[in-house]
């Protein structure tokens, strides 16, 4: 299994090639059979994808921080992901399942910044899954809190 930046036909239009430190790896049902089953992203590649901002209260922050980053859906598209379930893993090996349907129907983001600043590992970075809790109050519950993984480093796409 090879690790590469974006592969296939979308690589030229979706994001630049890998040039910095890998902060996110997608594995499983990604890419094409010819390119392998792992796609790596650095911060620049994630920044090149369509960005979204969510201002929302969370159980883990004071006030209503402004989170920004690419939607999970755009990351899945860039990695040519196909599947129904995501296993999102953190630095400490915590993992949570997220239905791909969440990414397709809710503007969930892989936040790389809080209030315009890159999220450090100490502040729950490099990537934090953020749901639009204030915009969709029905999401403010334990089901979605467990899917809001912080210190994300890997996503496995399952069938």
For every predicted segment, state its role:
Residues 10-159:
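N-terminal intrinsically disordered, low-complexity segments enriched in P/E/S/T
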Residues 1-11:
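N-terminal export signals
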